[in-house]
Amino acid sequence: YLLPMLGCIWSCPTDQMLRFPVATMIRFCHNHGLIRVSDRPQWHTVRGGSRAYVRRMLATIPDARAGTPVRAVRRVPPDSGSAGVWLDTDQGSERFDAVVLAGHTDQSLALLGDQARADERALLGAIRYQRNRAVLHTDASVLPRRRKAWAAWNYVRSPELAQEQSAVCLHYLINRLQPLPWQRPVLVSLNPQAEPAAGTVHGEFAYEHPVFDQAAIAAQARLPQIQGRGRVWYAGAWTRYGFHEDGLRSGLAAADALQAAWAAEDAGAPRAAEAA
């Protein structure tokens, strides 16, 4: 019961879930009512899905630049007489007072390039990612034969040990998770062992989910040591449990820390984060 459920939550093979720190796992399961099999909490979903609140947040940002990938992040040299960060895009380079890198840790390291410091490389490099393939389709044949056995999450165990250890296979029955206006089953299959019928496939997507092993949990605890160094801050779902709420929480924490740093500058206090 426990390993398949955790594999579904974190989109990781059950073999990797065995390496998940026990204290962190129990704390999460207890907080979310997952340890008990019956009388679980009633979950709510956002009307319109996650894009609804993303759009609401974007509407409050006056100069949001979607579709403008950043190619590199360059810190202004401390001996230049000024401070800040340069962002390089296909449209050119632009200087900012500070930057919050809110992507995956390997993406942040790639953006920093040679300017990544040793402690940043050690911490960000400790977070590993699990590649997953998601297929959106309407082929109900991937679900259990008995319709009464259909669940919101349908875990499939592979008879091949190598496949079972490399990727988790599960089928999300979206009709059970979101109030869709269709009676026909709509599914998202993660790493399907048997391909859905071609005529039922509506999209394929590649994802990378953080793996929360002992090294990752230890890296999370060290995050304050690199925050704000050289005016670079970090945020993302990887800083906690890997969910949307964790990404939001870390973003708010980074914003509060930035505000405190700027308040200290306005008051004439030295910027502690610039010391290293």
State where each predicted segment sits.
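Active-site/ligand-binding neighborhood in enzyme catalytic cores
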Residues: 1-74
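A structural signal for well-ordered alpha-helical segments within the folded catalytic domains
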Residues: 48-55, 106, 249-252
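Short glycine/proline-enriched coil/turn segments at helix->beta-strand junctions
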Residues: 58-64, 90-92, 228-229
